[in-house]
Amino acid sequence: MNPSRNLFLIGPTGAGKTSVGRRLAAHYGLAFVDLDHEIERRTGTDVATVFAVEGEVGFRRRESTLLAELSAGDGVLLVTGAGAVLAADNRALLATRGYVLWLQAGIEQQLERLAHDHQRPLLAGTDRRTRLEAMATIREPLYSETADLALPATHGIATTCSQAIALIDRHWQRHSLPTPSPAA
């Protein structure tokens, strides 16, 4: 059990991490950060362009640096990109700096949710099913290794959020954030 002040969401692309994460952050009073969106904000361009210019290695380097920075504090709900778990250092940071919920999604569900999304660089120009299956084979053991809890995200966002809250409340030994001292 990881007593923590942070909550991290991991899982495959199309699992609903960002949508669920926003609601969970509001529920628990945590600052919401989406790692991919933060990379876009800081670079001034989208993830696909970062991949095109810097390659996956450059993107993963940025991702790791930003994860280390943003997970260092307290009171954050951070949504990782689907591939953040590929780096052992990232997995270690997640495991030691927060409570980790793995939102699980099957291939059919991912294909349905990503049908109109053409901004995913690792899914561009390939047979999406084959690519998603290959990524799942590599990443699912890493998600399992890193996660404190796993939740199949097989329903809509509202239902998944309700299920996540019930699951988290049963298992997360959350440390309270420090209360400010009264002014003297």
Regions found by a protein language model. Give the residues of each.
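Hydrophobic positions on the alpha1 helix immediately C-terminal to the Walker A/P-loop
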Residues: 20
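P-loop (Walker A) phosphate-binding loop of NTP-binding proteins
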Residues: 12
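ATP-dependent small-molecule kinase phosphotransfer cores
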Residues: 34-95, 119-120, 133, 142
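A glycine- and Lys/Arg-enriched "phosphate-lid" helix/loop adjacent to the NTP-binding pocket
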Residues: 96-141
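NTP-dependent small-molecule kinase module
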Residues: 2-3, 23, 27, 73, ...
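Short glycine-rich anion-binding loops that position phosphate/pyrophosphate groups of nucleotides
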Residues: 82-84, 106-108, 156
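Conserved lysine of the Walker
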Residues: 17
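Hydrophobic anchor at the beta1->P-loop junction of P-loop NTPases
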Residues: 9
